[in-house]
Amino acid sequence: MRLFLSLPVLVVVLLMILEGPVPAQGAPEAVDASSGLDKLKEFGNTLENKVREFFSRIKESDIPTKTRNWFSETLQKVKEKLNIES
């Protein structure tokens, strides 16, 4: 049982050793607050435009109507099979 548990641990340790040292991380760039806010605002505007375009495409498509009709027809069939009146 010990051998069964120690083999995976040994493999993980060997992989860590063979991987070598972790590369040094670069110093974070000094970004002033205004450029960070500008990037955030640009991202927000882009996201807003994409979401508006997505919802306008859905409104213009016939998918919601087809889906609503399909659910209505399916519900009607189930009611007929169960003899439920509404």
Swiss-Prot record:
KW Magnesium (keyword) present: no
Compartments, record wording: Secreted
Domain of life: Eukaryota
One Pfam family it belongs to: ApoC-I
Record keywords, A-Z: Lipid transport, Secreted, Signal, Transport, VLDL
InterPro entries reported for this sequence: ApoC-1_sf (IPR043081), ApoC-I (IPR006781)
Role played: Inhibitor of lipoprotein binding to the low density lipoprotein (LDL) receptor, LDL receptor-related protein, and very low density lipoprotein (VLDL) receptor. Associates with high density lipoproteins (HDL) and the triacylglycerol-rich lipoproteins in the plasma and makes up about 10% of the protein of the VLDL and 2% of that of HDL. Appears to interfere directly with fatty acid uptake and is also the major plasma inhibitor of cholesteryl ester transfer protein (CETP). Binds free fatty acids and reduces their intracellular esterification.
Protein name per Swiss-Prot or TrEMBL: Apolipoprotein C-I
